[in-house]
Regions:
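Charged catalytic cores and adjacent phosphate/nucleic-acid-binding surfaces used
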Residues: 1-153
Length: 153
């Protein structure tokens, strides 16, 4: 609690987490069409089949119940930095991920700290470009919904 309040020299120095779009229930899901529904939130029925048999996503639910347009974190709180786990990146199978981890110790090092050249030296330019694009937010994400994780498009 002291770190959350920035008391007695304690503080949060970084705040990393999964991009919400990758979550299993981020967007509303049409049970009839069997797919997540993109578009202006909140979604209360499927625009394709007009069904109201939907599983409402977290993003859409927040739009319905929010009481403010924006929120503000305390000035001492670091920003929330979205990350995309290696397992979500196309072209990175278990062997490639193991190779990266054996060379660089932790996924956090790979996702946030290493240079493109360091990554490229171990797994090649194509994979290094994917990791760096994900780090910089230069990837398109197909939102998850209805119990299915989102994915890089």
């Amino acid at each position: 609690v002291k770190a959350l309040k920035n008391e007695e020299g304690r503080k949060i120095i970084a705040n990393y987490g999964l991009d919400p779009k990758l979550g299993k229930y981020h967007r509303t899901f049409c049970e009839k069409c069997g797919k997540p529904i993109e578009g202006q939130a909140p979604i209360t029925h499927c625009p394709d089949c007009d069904s109201s048999n939907i599983t409402m996503g977290v993003f859409d639910r927040i739009e319905i119940i929010k009481d403010k347009e924006t929120t503000k974190s305390p000035s001492f709180r670091p920003p929330y930095i979205y990350q995309i786990p290696l397992t979500f990146m196309p072209g990175l199978g278990n062997k490639t991920i193991d190779k990266l981890l054996n060379n660089f110790d932790t996924e956090m090092n790979i996702l946030h700290k290493l240079s493109k050249d360091d990554i490229e030296a171990v797994v090649g330019e194509k994979i290094a470009n994917i990791v760096i694009a994900a780090r910089e937010g230069n990837v398109k994400i197909q939102s998850g919904g209805g119990g299915v994780y989102g994915k890089l498009a």
